[in-house]
């Protein structure tokens, strides 16, 4: 059986994140839990749960209760997770972490193509990143190559005439 490898918080990022981020990652590592396992207990997507750990997604009171119980962390130390997140400050721009840079590169290389196709399909507007869902899946093709499948689902918001 393959060993489960866990995502952890890099020390160089900790100062840019909320205090509860370190607490959550330490408890996650100690309990040997994946984001998938935590998400299953919370009834949330694993990307949303990871976003909570990085301070980019607001947690509900129920999320805090469940995290406290699952991770063995006092609720009081997680109480600020229900505050409004200060998004977009967790890393430098452009990104320097290779995987995150590849995602940035996808937008650099295909952003205008996405825009053109979306404008043709939906009209003049934008895809919301607020009324939004995302998912990450793993696929293995017929040749045995592993592929990452990232789904981005955002509500279409047409620009209004004023």
Curated annotation (Swiss-Prot):
A GO molecular-function annotation: cyanate hydratase activity
User: What are its E.C. numbers?
Assistant: 4.2.1.104
A GO biological-process term: cyanate metabolic process
Name the reaction it catalyses. cyanate + hydrogencarbonate + 3 H(+) = NH4(+) + 2 CO2
Which InterPro entries is this protein grouped with?
Answer: Cro/C1-type_HTH (IPR001387), Cyanase (IPR008076), Cyanate_lyase_C (IPR003712), Cyanate_lyase_C_sf (IPR036581), Lambda_DNA-bd_dom_sf (IPR010982)
What residues make up the catalytic site?
Answer: 102, 105, 128
Keyword annotations from UniProtKB, A to Z: Lyase
Q: Which SUPFAM superfamilies does the annotation name?
A: Cyanase C-terminal domain, lambda repressor-like DNA-binding domains
Out of the domains of life, which is the source?
Eukaryota
* Pfam families per the UniProt record, alphabetical: Cyanate_lyase
Which NCBIfam families does UniProt cross-reference here?
A: cynS
Q: What does this protein do?
A: Catalyzes the reaction of cyanate with bicarbonate to produce ammonia and carbon dioxide.
HAMAP family the UniProt entry points to: Cyanate_hydrat (MF_00535)
Q: Which family does it belong to?
A: Belongs to the cyanase family.
* The name this protein goes by in its record: Cyanate hydratase
Give the organism the record lists: Pyricularia oryzae (strain 70-15 / ATCC MYA-4617 / FGSC 8958)
| Name of the coding gene | CYN1
């Amino acid at each position: 059986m393959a060993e489960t490898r866990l995502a952890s918080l890099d020390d160089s990022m900790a100062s840019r994140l909320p205090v509860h981020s370190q607490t959550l990652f330490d408890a996650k590592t100690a309990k040997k839990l994946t984001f998938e396992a935590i998400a299953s207990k919370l009834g949330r997507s694993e990307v949303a749960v990871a976003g909570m750990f990085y301070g980019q997604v607001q947690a509900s009171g129920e999320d805090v209760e469940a995290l406290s119980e699952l991770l063995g962390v006092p609720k009081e130390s997680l109480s600020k997770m229900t505050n409004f997140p200060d998004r977009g400050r967790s890393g430098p721009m452009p990104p320097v972490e290779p995987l995150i840079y590849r995602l940035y590169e996808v937008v650099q290389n295909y952003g205008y193509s996405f825009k053109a196709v979306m404008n043709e399909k939906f009209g003049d507007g934008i895809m919301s990143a607020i009324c939004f869902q995302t998912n990450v899946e793993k696929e293995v093709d017929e040749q045995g190559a592993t592929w990452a499948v990232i789904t981005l689902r955002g509500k279409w918001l047409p620009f209004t005439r004023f």
